[in-house]
C-alpha cells in the first residue's frame, strides 16, 4: 500500500530547465490574484491575433446574467495559429508523425505540407458549399488527415463535430441530427489492432436517418471497395488536386464556435459541448507548453483518439499551436504485441508520452520485459489522463517506464474544461502517486458538501470550480438552458464538475471519481442512462438499470440489471444477444461486462430507482446497502443480492 506520505520531489535538473519552476508557479499564483486581467492577457498573447483583444474576461455564473466570454473583441484564426505562423521558421520541420496500425508503416507531414493539405481540404469544403458557421461531422480513423480535416474546418470557420470511430451508425445519426450538420468527412475504412473498421458503411447506415446530409467527403485509406452514392459522395483523392493549394484563413471572433464534441452526462442524450475560438486555443496552447514543459524539436505523443477531447486538445490543437511535433498512432497498445507502445517510442524518439491509466494497467499485466527490452532513453516526461490512476499503476509507470527518473503529470480535466485544470507542473510540483496535485494558476477549485457549503482544509467532498478559465465550454449546442441547469444550478454560482474529490493537508487534490451517473470505462466516458435506453429498446427488455463497478483493467466496468418482459425466458443466449445489441446501438466500448437478470428493481414508493443500492450490490459491498425499508418492495433487494453476478 502507498500512503499519502510518499512524495517524489522535483528532479533538480528538470526544475532548472523547466518553463515553470516552483518560484515561477508561486509568482503566477500571486500575479493572477493581483492582476488577473494582465495574467490572462499574457496567456492570450501566446497566440497570433488579427485584432488583439482589449476585453479580457466577462463572466457571471449567476442565473440572472449568466455569461462566459473571454477575449470577446479579439479576432484570430485557429488554423493560422497552428500552421501559418510557424511557416517562416519551421516550414520543413515535422508537424505530424504518423505511425500506422501495422508496424513498419509510418510517415511524416512537415508544417509546409500540413499547410498545403489543410488549404486544399478547406478549398474542397468551400467548393462543396460549406460556409462559416456550418457544422461538419468528422468520422475518421486516427490518421493525419483527421487533424487536416479539423484544421480545414477551422480555416474556413466551419464548426467541426468529430465522432469517435468506435460509435455505431445510430450514435452517429444522433450526433448529426442534434447539430443539423449537412456535411460528413469519413474514410473507406479504418484499421485497429489488425482489424478493419467499416467507417463508410457505418456512415451510409447513419445517413438513412439523415436525408438532409447532402455531401460526404470520403478519404481512400485502406483502398477497400466501398459503394459510392452518386451526387452525394466525393473522394478526397479525386478532388484534392482540382483546388488551389492556398486558402486564406477566415478571420474569426474569439467567441465564434470552433467545435462541438458530444459527451455523456448523467441524464438524457449526449450533450454537444461547444468550445469557442480564442479562449479554447489559448488554454490548449498554454497548458500544453506549461504542463508538458514542451521544448522545440521534441516529439510529443498523446495516445488518445481525436474522437475524444484529449485528442482535440493534445494531439492536434495544443501541440500545433506551439509549433510542436505530434505523433498520431492509428493502432492499439497490444497489437501486434504488448511491446508496441514502447517500440514506437524508440522508433520515433518520443520525448513526452501521455496515455490513460487503463492502457497502463493492461500493459502492466503483461510483464515488465515488454517494456524493458526497449531503450526508452528518449523519454523525458510521462503523463496520465482520463480517470484516476491507482498508485500501483502510477508506481509501475514511474519505475518500469520512467526508470525512477521521469516525472508523471497526472492531469485532471474534462471535455467541458477544454484543457487541464488540476495537474502537477513537472518543474514545480512534488508528486504523490494517485494525486492530480494542485490547480493551475487562475483555476479555483473548492470542495463542497451536499448543500454546497465550502469545506476547508483536509477534507472530502464534491469538486466545484468557482471561477472561469479561458478554455471553459460556452454552451450545450442548441440548449443553453441545459448548459446552465447541468453545471451551474446544483451549487448556484459555481461550476459543478460531477467529480468527488479529497484534499489532503498539503492542499493536494485526489479525484475519487464521478458522483453522478457517468461512468468511466477504459477511459471512455459513458452515461448509464444511454446504456439503459439502448437496453430497453430491445424487444425483450421491460426495464434496465446500469451502474459502474470497479474493474481491474478498465477502471470501471458496466454492470446492467435487466428486467425482462413477461413470458420472456432469461437464457445465456439472450444475455449474449443483449451485449451485442448494446455494441450495435452505441458502440463496442459500451457493451455491458455483466448482465444480471432482475425480476424487480429497488424503487422508492414514488417509483424512483435506488441506484445507490444497485451500485453497492455491483461493487459487492453488501454490508453497506443502507436503509432499504423505504423501498416499495424491500424483498427485491434480497433477490438481487442472492443472484448477484460474480465480478
Ligand atoms: C475523469 C477527459 C482522475 C473525471 C479529459 C472527469 C480523471 C472525467 C482524470 C472527464 C484524472 C479525467 N484523474 N479522474 N487525471 N482525468 N478524469 O470528459 O471523472 O472524457 O470528470 O475528459 O474523467 O472525462 P472526459
UniProtKB/Swiss-Prot annotation:
Binding site for ATP: 386-388, 410-415, 499, 514, 525
Pfam families (alphabetical): ACAS_N, AMP-binding, AMP-binding_C
UniProt GO cellular component terms: cytosol
Binding-site residues, CoA: 192-195, 310, 334, 522, 583
Family: Belongs to the ATP-dependent AMP-binding enzyme family.
NCBIfam families for the chain: Ac_CoA_lig_AcsA, PRK00174.1
Name the record gives this protein: Acetyl-coenzyme A synthetase
Amino acid at each position: 500500500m502507498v500512503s499519502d506520505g510518499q512524495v517524489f520531489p522535483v528532479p533538480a535538473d528538470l526544475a532548472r530547465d523547466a518553463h515553470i519552476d516552483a518560484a515561477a508557479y508561486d509568482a503566477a499564483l500571486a500575479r493572477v490574484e493581483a492582476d488577473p486581467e494582465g495574467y490572462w492577457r499574457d496567456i492570450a498573447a501566446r497566440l497570433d491575433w488579427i485584432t488583439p483583444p482589449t476585453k479580457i474576461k466577462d463572466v457571471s455564473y449567476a442565473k440572472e446574467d449568466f455569461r462566459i466570454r473571454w477575449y470577446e473583441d479579439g479576432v484570430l484564426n485557429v488554423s493560422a495559429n497552428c500552421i501559418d505562423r510557424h511557416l517562416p521558421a519551421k516550414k520543413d520541420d515535422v508537424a505530424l508523425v504518423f505511425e500506422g496500425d501495422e508496424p513498419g508503416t509510418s510517415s511524416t507531414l512537415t508544417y509546409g505540407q500540413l499547410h498545403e493539405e489543410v488549404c486544399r481540404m478547406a478549398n474542397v469544403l468551400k467548393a462543396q458549399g460549406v460556409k462559416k458557421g456550418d457544422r461538419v461531422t468528422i468520422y475518421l480513423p486516427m490518421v493525419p488527415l483527421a487533424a487536416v480535416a479539423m484544421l480545414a474546418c477551422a480555416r474556413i470557420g466551419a464548426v467541426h463535430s468529430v465522432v469517435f470511430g468506435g460509435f455505431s451508425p445510430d450514435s452517429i445519426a444522433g450526433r448529426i441530427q442534434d447539430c443539423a450538420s449537412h456535411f460528413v468527412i469519413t474514410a473507406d475504412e479504418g484499421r485497429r489492432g489488425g482489424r478493419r473498421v467499416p467507417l463508410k458503411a457505418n456512415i451510409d447506415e447513419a445517413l438513412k436517418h439523415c436525408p438532409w446530409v447532402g455531401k460526404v467527403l470520403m478519404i481512400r485509406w485502406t483502398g477497400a471497395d466501398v459503394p459510392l452514392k452518386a451526387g452525394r459522395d466525393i473522394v478526397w483523392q479525386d478532388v484534392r488536386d482540382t483546388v488551389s493549394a492556398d486558402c486564406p484563413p477566415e478571420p474569426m471572433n474569439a467567441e465564434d464556435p470552433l467545435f462541438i464534441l458530444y459527451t455523456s452526462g448523467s441524464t438524457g442524450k449526449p450533450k454537444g459541448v461547444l468550445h469557442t475560438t480564442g479562449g479554447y486555443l489559448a488554454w490548449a496552447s498554454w497548458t500544453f507548453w506549461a504542463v508538458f514543459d514542451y521544448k522545440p524539436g521534441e516529439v510529443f505523443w498523446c495516445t488518445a483518439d481525436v474522437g475524444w477531447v484529449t485528442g482535440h486538445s493534445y494531439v492536434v490543437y495544443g501541440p500545433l499551436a506551439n509549433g510542436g511535433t505530434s505523433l498520431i498512432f492509428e493502432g492499439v497498445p497490444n497489437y501486434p504485441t504488448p511491446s508496441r507502445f514502447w517500440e514506437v517510442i524508440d522508433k520515433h524518439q518520443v520525448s513526452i508520452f501521455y496515455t490513460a491509466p487503463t492502457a497502463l494497467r493492461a500493459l502492466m499485466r503483461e510483464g515488465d520485459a515488454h517494456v524493458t527490452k526497449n531503450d526508452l532513453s528518449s523519454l523525458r516526461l510521462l503523463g496520465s489522463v482520463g480517470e484516476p490512476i491507482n498508485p500501483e499503476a502510477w508506481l509501475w509507470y514511474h519505475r518500469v517506464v520512467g526508470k525512477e527518473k521521469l516525472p508523471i503529470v497526472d492531469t485532471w480535466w474534462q471535455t467541458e474544461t477544454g484543457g487541464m485544470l488540476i495537474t502537477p507542473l513537472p518543474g514545480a510540483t512534488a508528486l504523490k502517486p494517485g494525486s492530480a496535485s494542485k490547480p493551475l494558476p487562475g483555476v479555483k477549485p473548492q470542495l463542497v458538501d451536499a448543500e454546497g457549503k465550502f469545506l476547508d482544509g483536509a477534507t472530502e467532498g464534491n469538486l466545484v470550480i468557482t471561477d472561469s478559465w479561458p478554455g471553459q465550454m460556452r454552451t450545450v449546442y442548441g440548449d443553453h438552458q441545459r448548459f446552465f441547469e447541468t453545471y451551474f444550478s446544483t451549487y448556484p454560482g459555481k461550476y459543478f464538475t460531477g467529480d468527488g474529490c479529497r484534499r489532503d493537508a498539503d492542499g493536494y487534490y485526489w479525484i475519487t471519481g464521478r458522483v453522478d451517473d457517468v461512468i468511466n470505462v477504459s477511459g471512455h466516458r459513458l452515461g448509464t442512462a444511454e446504456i439503459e435506453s439502448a437496453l430497453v429498446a430491445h424487444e425483450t427488455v421491460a426495464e434496465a438499470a446500469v451502474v459502474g463497478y470497479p474493474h481491474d483493467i478498465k477502471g470501471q466496468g458496466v454492470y446492467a440489471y435487466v428486467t425482462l418482459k413477461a413470458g420472456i425466458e432469461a437464457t445465456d443466449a439472450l444475455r449474449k444477444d443483449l451485449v451485442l445489441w448494446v455494441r450495435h446501438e452505441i458502440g463496442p466500448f459500451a457493451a455491458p461486462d455483466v448482465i444480471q437478470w432482475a425480476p424487480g428493481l429497488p424503487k422508492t414508493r414514488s417509483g424512483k430507482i435506488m441506484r445507490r443500492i444497485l451500485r453497492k450490490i455491483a461493487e459487492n459491498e453488501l454490508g453497506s446497502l443502507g436503509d432499504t425499508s423505504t423501498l416499495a418492495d424491500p424483498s427485491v433487494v434480497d433477490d438481487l443480492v442472492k443472484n448477484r453476478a460474480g465480478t
